[in-house]
Amino acid sequence: MRVLVVCPVHDPRDARIAEREIPALLAAGHDVTQAGPFTAVGAIAQPGVRPIDIPRSVGRKRARALRHTRRMLREQAPHHDIVLLHSPDAVIAASGLDHAGIVWDVHEDTAAAVGTKPWLPRALAAPAAWSIRAGEAWAERNVHLLLAEHSYADRFARSHPVVPNSVFVPDAVPRPERGRVVYLGSVTRARGARELIEVGRLLADGPAIRVDVIGGAGPEVLGDVEVARDRGWIAWHGYVKNSVALSLVDGATAGLSLLHDEPNYRHSMPTKLLEYLAHGVPFVSTPLPLAVELAEVSGGGIIVPFGDLGAAYDAIVELNADDDRRQKMADIGREWVRANANWAIDGAAFIRQLEEWARG
């Protein structure tokens, strides 16, 4: 099977694309071409993958990337059995393409997220969301859909296969030690940048628990993040490859997820929570519905109210002080992920589904 993976929006090193799906395809013996903004983000393709460099679609500057992606698809799609799209921009670029193997991997709710984008004027948020929903309806009629969340099914009229954003579970992990908590993911206002900084300040002034922040910072919070780093409130690592980032998670006291109550977060499982548990680290999270559910069914997390810095601080300090509780939460959470959110299982289902569509 020859697969063309296309995304002009995300970093080509995106964890679902580059560390789950592409390795699964290569391991199954399939040929992979990846079209993405390699030059724009300073990335290189992984071994075994043929790269195609395209401009990045970002903010209001999308027309050039759309034109290049559309032209690339017309040239490359006929030579591939599956064209795997990873963003609405890629779906737009593929419109009108006569190819039976086009697949849209839906792994975010762009219409719900558009209101949080700092580059979009508030007055345009509702029309933009409507346009995206209309695009989803068009895609459902014209291409195959693969959903990353069961909750995404409500956005579509028909049923579609689900391949969850599950994670790799290492064979062995270190014990969760005292003195260090981690945050893994993009650092933006909606993802709790202010809360991370303030919790870091409280912890630095109190029990001296370090806050490792692993991820690139959005322009609206970059200055604040740099100040917090310089003052020693957080240890900011910036963007690093997911596999490297996870090595920094190993052995932490707790993993943090202080996301705000935004529409696009309400129906998505924060993958970072699964990654924390898979690496033997309990989590502290705000009460988004799927985070609450995960804390309950796995036993590996503590839920704190939105914006409640005191509650987040207390949860971290309590976990830091109680070695037995911390280890128990880590152990049972890790076993839950192994049984219920394991890419070793879901990756095989992903391959089977693409092979079925490729056969027609």
Model-derived features with residue positions:
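Conserved acidic donor-binding segment of nucleotide-sugar-dependent glycosyltransferases
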Residues: 297-298, 302-310, 318-324
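Glycosyltransferase donor-sugar binding loop
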Residues: 210-223, 238
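Conserved donor-binding/catalytic core segment of Leloir-type glycosyltransferases
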Residues: 4-6, 146, 173-201, 212
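A short, well-ordered alpha-helix in the C-terminal region of glycosyltransferases
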Residues: 318, 325-340
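Membrane-proximal helix-turn-helix segments that form the acceptor-binding/catalytic region
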Residues: 23, 67-77, 92, 104, ...
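N-terminal strand-loop element at the rim of the active site
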Residues: 5-15, 19-64, 76, 152, ...
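Nucleotide-sugar-dependent
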Residues: 16, 191, 241-248, 253-274, ...
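Nucleotide-activated donor-binding/catalytic signature segment of Leloir-type glycosyltransferases, i.e.
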Residues: 222-251
